[in-house]
From Swiss-Prot:
Originating organism: Shewanella woodyi (strain ATCC 51908 / MS32)
Family from the record: Belongs to the UPF0260 family.
Pfam hit, one: CxxCxxCC
InterPro entries xref list: Puta_zinc/iron-chelating_dom, UCP006173
Cross-referenced NCBIfam families: PRK05170.1-4, PRK05170.1-5, PRK05170.2-5
Name of the molecule in the record: UPF0260 protein Swoo_2117
Superkingdom assignment: Bacteria
Length: 146
């Protein structure tokens, strides 16, 4: 059953909600906002807890202890999190779109997501190793395939 087609975001249980996250790691990238234009820019500087090989948080259950500023995506705040990439399942479903063809719930694994270049896998640097974050602005996190 494709629960995400049968239920609204508000009707999902915790397990269903968590499974919507494809584990791309894009939400764990540091972002900048231009002071003059208020335009959002993604960087390839990732949270210190992000595993660069597969894009998951190495301390997911305790992430708020290690990174108090980490944002928890919920049904109550997804509308306000406009910085989530267009490829994000939470954002897509909130906006009435389908899950992308490469999503692990569609394909059964993360392999298609990585092959499509839709994750942070091998594309990021740890934020603690970045000196000038402005030098690390990238466009690929904003890319969306379908």
């Amino acid at each position: 059953m494709s629960f995400w087609k049968e239920k609204s975001l508000a009707q999902l249980d915790t397990q269903e909600w968590e499974s919507l996250c494809d584990g791309c790691g894009k939400c764990c990238l540091n972002k900048l906002i231009d002071d003059e234009t208020e335009e959002l820019y993604y960087t390839n500087a990732a949270c210190k807890l992000l595993d660069h090989q597969d894009g998951h948080c190495v301390h997911y259950q305790e992430r708020f202890t290690f990174v108090p500023s980490c944002t928890q995506v919920t049904v109550d705040n997804v509308a306000q999190l406009t910085w989530l990439p267009d490829s994000c399942a939470y954002r897509r479903l909130y906006l009435g779109r389908e899950l992308p063809s490469w999503h692990p719930l569609i394909t059964g694994s993360k392999a298609a997501m990585h092959e499509a270049g839709m994750s942070t896998q091998n594309k990021v640097k740890c934020e603690t190793k970045v000196r000038y974050i402005e030098d690390h602005i990238v466009l690929w996190p904003m890319r969306d395939l379908d």
